[in-house]
Every structure is written in structure tokens, then in C-alpha cells.
Curated annotation (Swiss-Prot):
UniProt main location, coarse: cytoplasm
Region Disordered: start-end pairs: 100-160, 359-383
Pfam family, one: IPK
UniProt-annotated binding residues for substrate: P220, C221, V222, L223, D224, L225, K226, M227, G228
Cross-referenced Gene3D superfamilies: Inositol polyphosphate kinase
An annotated GO BP: phosphatidylinositol phosphate biosynthetic process
Name of the molecule in the record: Inositol hexakisphosphate kinase 1
Length: 433
């Protein structure tokens, strides 16, 4: 068993799933739409990801005015594999103790050599979450012949009331419905495979604890945007730098300073999330990027015009903050745009469509009929939106970790991307008034 069994456990977060009397059973974060490291759910308000020391130090060094636009940094946990009574292996988090010998992932996943996936069966188990759509846990068991298979055998048992579907960018056809974002499953399988192959001695791994920025949203619609005109860090090898520059040149990263890295948007007409991944985003033209943004703001029945001003206000605020951050560079970082896919106005619209009635514009509020008093927002309540910067494994600024390269002025590539994103949204708003 894992060497961290004897550690004392501190306070658990709200609705954290306990593993025996000691650790917290980690579950896949079902709303992950992009990235390459698997995000794990620690509790309702907290997620965790493999620790990269540069990213940890960056969170610890954030300027105060940037904290509004980044997830709250909550510390570090030790993570290891543990078996349960059914023979499955789970990822379990324990309080981090400074004296422990732990592994941390200072080499981003895409730089690591490819490994054969061990054959395994993924098993879902329930959690203690209050949110039905988040009742999912993945674990795996190995077989004697597991080393020969190149990809895992997946067994899914749905626990979600809200299915996800990946839309194919070529055919326009949807994949089968599953109970969490397909990209989340992909990242989690890769993470387990890599950690499993490296954990013959039951090593401990360090994971960052971060705020779950979608926990305020009932039906989180998430757009993951890779920001900036450059994606490689100052310490990248010549080979990797060339590879990243090609990706930028062949996508809207070069022309707009921003490209789609993933998204999920709740569709009122079907009751499921429509999903896109980074490969879709890489192939978009400027017009294709506009169309993707339009799709992100469309709920299957209507364009969410009420979202334009709240999102634009957040983006303008972020731009103003970043323009004041001299020497900062956020290479390969992403920007999350989030809103709730099922709010009062949308529910009223869906009700009238279902009943074949004409659309009634007045939203619910104090003066509405009793039949609509259970709906959430009032007429003066703007829709809830959020904008957060994430992924700082390649970020730098003057004096950070004695980095030899020091840059002048703000991150102009990132600001360029924000300017274009704001401009496109303003044009879309004006065209759809």
C-alpha cells in the first residue's frame, strides 16, 4: 500500500469523497474542455492537477489585481494509488507534508516520451457530490497481459443527468452521449496511464489544489481559449519551439492572437452539452473562429444576447489589468469564459417553445405570475459570467526564479488576442441587436 497511510488528515473540503479513514478519493473533473493534464475533482469547490513547480510559484507570486481573473490557489496535496475492496486502483489525495519524498511533473505532458498504454478497465463509482452531473469516478484494474495493449478498454456506467456529445468538425455528426466531457476522459486515461507506469514503487505525486471556477454554475458552458501569438516558453528546446510556432502559424493564434482550445455549451433544445476539442480549434479560419464563438453563445434555441455586455465587461477589465503587468509573459496559458446554460430567461423561452406559444419577453421577477416564481433570476439580474486565466507552466516575469530572459512591457501577444476577442464580440453584438 501507499506509504502515506500513516499521515494525519486535516480538514476535508465540502463533499469530498473519503477513501477509508484517511484520504480523499479523487474523481475526474467532468467539465474539463481543454488542456493536456487531467483535472481532478477534490470537492465541490476544489479541483487539483499535477504540480509543475513553475506554475505553483507563479500562483504564489500573482499580483493582487490579477487574482480576480485567476483560480484561487489552495495549496498542495500528495496523491498516490490505492486499491479498494473490489480490486480497483484509485487516485487518493492526502495532506502534503514537506518532508515527504514526492514526484512532481516538471516536464509538461506533451514533452514526455510516448508510452504504450497498459490495458485496463475503467470503472465508475458514485461520489458524495450534491450535483448529480458530477457523480463520476474513474479507476482501473490491470490484467496479466496488460502490457501488450496500446490503448485502454473503457467501461462506462453513466451517473449524469446531462449527457455530453462531441460534434465532429468534418461531418457535423455527434458522437454517442456520455456522462462527462470527452476531453476529460481522454486526459484522465492518459494521466492514469503515465502515473501507473511510473509508480512501481508506489510513489507519491504532488498535485496543486485550485478553485473550481465552475462550481457556481448549474449548467456550466465553458470556452477554453489559447491566448497569445506565441505558445512556447523561454526554456523550450529548438525542436519544441519550432513545433509550437508551426501550430500558431497554421491557426488563428497568428492572425488573431487567440484560438479555440475546447468548449462545451448546454443545448436547451436537446438537453445535452455540445462539445468541441482543440483539434477543431486548430483548423479554424478567422471566420470559423467567429462561427465557433457564435455557437458557444447559442443555446440551441436562441443566441444569448444577454451575455454580450457581461462578458465584454470582464474581458475589458482583464485587458486593463494585463496592460499594467510589465515584463509578464503568459506563454501557452488559456482563458476560460464561463456562463450558465440554463437560467431564468432560457427556461421561459423553452417552456413557450414546448407549448407552441408565442415567445413572451418579460423575464421572471417580483411581478411575475406564481407559476414562474421558482425561476432564478429577476429582470434586473444580469446573467452570471466569469473569465479566468489558467495554465501558467510557461509563464515568467522579471525576477521570477532567476529566469535569464527578461521581457519589456506587457504581454502584447496576449493583449492582441484580447483586443480581437473583444472586437469580434462587439461586432457580433451589434449585428444581432
Amino acid at each position: 500500500m501507499c506509504v502515506c497511510q500513516t499521515m494525519e488528515v486535516g480538514q476535508y473540503g465540502k463533499n469530498a469523497s473519503r477513501a477509508g479513514d484517511r484520504g480523499v478519493l479523487l474523481e475526474p473533473f467532468i467539465h474539463q474542455v481543454g488542456g493536456h493534464s487531467s483535472m481532478m475533482r477534490y470537492d465541490d469547490h476544489t479541483v487539483c492537477k499535477p504540480l509543475i513547480s513553475r506554475e505553483q510559484r507563479f500562483y504564489e507570486s500573482l499580483p493582487p489585481e490579477m487574482k480576480e481573473f485567476t483560480p484561487e490557489y489552495k495549496g498542495v496535496v500528495s496523491v498516490c494509488f490505492e486499491g479498494d475492496s473490489d480490486g480497483y486502483i484509485n487516485l487518493v489525495a492526502y495532506p502534503y507534508v514537506e518532508s515527504e519524498t514526492v514526484e512532481q511533473d516538471d516536464t509538461p505532458e506533451r514533452e514526455q516520451p510516448r508510452r504504450k498504454h497498459s490495458r485496463r478497465s475503467l470503472h465508475r463509482s458514485g461520489s458524495g457530490s450534491d450535483h448529480k452531473e458530477e457523480k463520476a469516478s474513474l479507476s482501473f484494474e490491470t490484467s496479466e497481459s496488460s502490457q501488450e495493449a496500446k490503448s485502454p478498454k473503457v467501461e462506462l456506467h453513466s451517473h449524469s443527468d446531462v449527457p455530453f456529445q462531441m460534434l465532429d468538425s468534418n461531418s457535423g455528426l455527434s458522437s454517442e452521449k456520455i456522462s462527462y466531457n470527452p476531453w476529460s476522459l481522454r486526459c484522465h486515461k492518459q494521466q492514469l496511464s503515465r502515473m501507473r507506469s511510473e509508480s512501481k514503487d508506489r510513489k507519491l505525486y504532488k498535485f496543486l489544489l485550485l478553485e473550481n471556477v465552475v462550481h457556481h454554475f448549474k449548467y456550466p458552458c465553458v470556452l477554453d481559449l489559447k491566448m497569445g501569438t506565441r505558445q512556447h516558453g523561454d526554456d523550450a528546446s529548438a525542436e519544441k519551439a519550432a513545433r509550437q510556432m508551426r501550430k500558431c502559424e497554421q491557426s488563428t493564434s497568428a492572425t488573431l492572437g487567440v484560438r479555440v482550445c475546447g468548449m462545451q455549451v448546454y443545448q436547451l433544445d436537446t438537453g445535452h452539452y455540445l462539445c468541441r476539442n482543440k483539434y477543431y480549434g486548430r483548423g479554424l479560419s478567422i471566420e470559423g473562429f467567429r462561427n465557433a464563438l457564435y455557437q458557444y453563445l447559442h443555446n440551441g434555441l436562441d443566441l444569448r444576447r444577454d451575455l454580450f455586455e457581461p462578458i465584454l465587461s470582464k474581458l475589458r477589465g482583464l485587458k486593463a489589468v494585463l496592460e499594467r503587468q510589465a515584463s509578464y509573459r503568459f506563454y501557452s496559458s488559456s482563458l476560460l469564459v464561463i456562463y450558465d446554460g440554463k437560467e431564468c430567461r432560457s427556461e421561459l423561452r423553452l417552456k413557450h417553445v414546448d407549448m407552441g406559444l408565442p415567445e413572451v419577453p418579460p423575464p421572471c421577477g417580483p411581478s411575475t405570475s406564481p407559476s414562474s416564481t421558482s425561476l432564478e433570476a429577476g429582470p434586473s439580474s444580469p446573467p452570471k459570467v466569469d473569465v479566468r486565466m489558467i495554465d501558467f507552466a510557461h509563464s515568467t516575469f522579471k525576477g521570477f526564479r532567476d529566469d535569464p530572459t527578461v521581457h519589456d512591457g506587457p504581454d502584447r501577444g496576449y493583449v492582441f488576442g484580447l483586443e480581437n476577442l473583444i472586437s469580434i464580440m462587439e461586432q457580433m453584438r451589434d449585428e444581432n441587436q
